[in-house]
Amino acid sequence: MTDTIEKVASTNPPTKQATRYLGNCTFIVMAWHQRLLEIKNKAQQLQGEDGEENSAYLQFFRTTISASDAAKLKRCQHMDDVAMQPAFIALWQQVEPTLIKSTANHSAYNHKVSDNAFAAWLAVAWVLSQVRTVDDRYLVASAGKSKRQLNNTLACVAGQRQDDGDRPLITPLRFEKLVSARDPNNFVSLLARMVAQLQQQGQAINVVWLANDILHWFADYQGSNYRTPKDKLTVQWSLTYYQMYSD
C-alpha cells in the first residue's frame, strides 16, 4: 500500500466485478486519478506503462488539469460545486462520449447522458479527489482465522479493526448512517468524509472499486437496477463490513 505513482501503475488488472459499472470508463478513471497523484506527489511522470489507451488518457489529463485545478476540486463542499471545476470537466470530456457510445444501442438516451449518470460522475470526481493513498489490490483476505477473500471495497477497509483490536476503523453507527442515506447529496457528503477519515488513519483505498461502487449506488438510486436485495450496493457493503469486523 502506497501513494507513489509506481504503485498506481501496477500491472495488476482490475477484476471484472470491480469494473461492472465503470465498464469502458475504467482506464479513464485510472488515468485521471493518476494525474491527481502526480500533482500531489510532484513525481516524475510515467511513460504510459498501463498500455497505449491509458497513456493517451493520461497525456490528455496532464495537459488539462493543473495543480490549482486539483486543489479546487478537493475543496468542494457540494456536488454542484464540482460541476464547475476544470478537473471534473476534463474527466467528463472523456467519460461522456464513452458513455454515449456504450449505451447508444441499449438506452433511451441515445444522444445524451441521463441526469442521474451525470450526478454519479460528479460524485466519482469529488470523492476520488480525496484519495491520496492508493491500494491496487482487488481482493484481500479477512483478518480472522478463516482468511476469506473479500472484495477490496471501501466497506472492507472501514470494517478493519483498529490497532487495539476491539473496534473497526469506522464505527458501526457511522457506517450505518452512510448505508442508510437515501439522498444523493447526503450519501456523497458522508462518503467523502469517510474516505477522508480513512486516509487520515493511514488507510489505502482502491480507487477503481470506489468509483465503481459510487456508480452502483446511483444505479440503485435510479431504480430497477437489481433483482434481489443482495444486488444492492448497500447490502453488499454491509455484508462485507461485518464480515471484516466480526471475522
Where are these regions (language model features)?
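Basic, alpha-helical nucleic-acid-binding regions used in initiation and control of genome expression
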Residues: T2, S10-D247
